[in-house]
């Protein structure tokens, strides 16, 4: 486990570049050790839907020292082979996402190309509690039930799936 300093989720802040106010709903921690935040600007578009989210680094956000917290991430899992037990989806653990409710997902990137499209196989995210791998400690059945009751997992399909080559921090959702 590695301790990292992050901005608390649900923090209301302003993006310095766009000057838009909004709320932090997720953060992602990658293999390089950097953190990006999913920023939901306040407001609705012409169709009455929320304005598209932005991935932003901490330096773009107007926040104070009280908005930070220290959390532990299982850094040792990144770069290792991981499998989602329910689907069998297997690949390298490339990043983590913390949801606003506290649930922790791992992004898995398989090897190879999608034969139909000739593009890298799309990465997918899964609740870490439902995955296995050499560096993942399994919870007992009782621990799992308690954890899921305290921090239920949102559906991984919360985010639009895009080819890995287009799915970079800083991209609008």
Features from the language model and the residues they span:
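Long, low-complexity intrinsically disordered regions
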Residues: 64-80, 85, 90-99, 129-173
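Basic/aromatic-rich interaction segments and small domains that mediate binding to polyanionic partners
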Residues: 2-3, 8, 12-60, 72, ...
């Amino acid at each position: 486990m590695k301790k990292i300093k992050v901005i608390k989720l649900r923090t209301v802040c302003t993006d310095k570049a766009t000057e838009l106010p909004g709320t932090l709903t997720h953060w992602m921690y990658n293999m390089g050790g950097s953190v990006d935040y999913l920023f939901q600007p306040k407001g609705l578009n012409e169709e009455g839907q929320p304005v598209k989210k932005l991935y932003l680094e901490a330096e773009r956000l107007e926040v104070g020292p009280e908005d930070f917290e220290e959390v532990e991430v299982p850094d040792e899992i990144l770069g290792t082979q991981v499998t989602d037990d329910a689907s069998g989806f297997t690949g390298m653990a490339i990043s983590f996402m913390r949801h606003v409710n506290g649930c922790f997902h791992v992004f898995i990137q398989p090897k190879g190309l999608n034969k139909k499209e000739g593009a890298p196989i799309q990465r997918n995210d899964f609740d870490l509690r439902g995955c296995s791998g050499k560096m993942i400690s399994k919870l007992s059945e009782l621990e799992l039930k308690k954890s899921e009751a305290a921090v239920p997992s949102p559906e991984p399909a919360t985010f639009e799936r895009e080819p890995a080559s287009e799915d970079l921090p800083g991209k609008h959702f």
